[in-house]
Design a protein with these regions (language model features):
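C-terminal-biased regions
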Residues: 19-39, 44-131
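N-terminal signal peptide c-region/cleavage motif recognized by signal peptidases
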Residues: 13-18
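Sec-dependent N-terminal signal peptides
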Residues: 4-12
């Protein structure tokens, strides 16, 4: 069963892989798109905030820095998955079907978030050329 779930998650992640841009250029592009919308809506406060965000991205964003941050995020999410797996095993040992279902749901959601974070890490890794 676990192999089937893992395979289906990998399939979903593979389908979404090319659809999300990563890196500083992608962040800058997203802010630029929002900036165009905010200007069209004549939303001065939002324009000011987005222009500030754009300046910060241009000044401080680096793909290597994003890669390091994403590595930390993935490690933290892996710890979360491990904790939910431990809680699920404890609920099974205790014979609590209600808790087993709850812990299984939390584990599944956590694994999905981890998979998405790993996919983004891989995209950043390819962007900066690390193997």
């Amino acid at each position: 069963m676990w192999k089937m779930i893992g395979a289906s998650l990998l399939l979903l992640a593979g389908q979404a892989y090319g659809s999300q841009a990563v890196g500083c250029k992608a962040r800058l592009k997203a802010v630029d798109e929002q900036l165009v919308e905010a200007k069209a809506q004549k939303n001065g406060d939002r324009v000011a905030g987005l222009e500030r965000a754009k300046r910060n991205i241009q000044a401080y964003c680096s793909d290597e820095g994003l890669y390091r941050e994403q590595q930390q995020r993935v490690a933290k999410m892996q710890q979360e998955v491990d904790a939910y797996l431990s809680e699920l095993q404890q609920a099974r040992v205790a014979g609590r079907p209600d808790r087993v279902a709850d812990k299984q749901g939390k584990l599944d959601a956590s694994q999905l978030r981890l998979l998405e974070a790993e996919r983004e890490l891989l995209a950043l890794q390819q962007l900066i050329g690390k193997s």
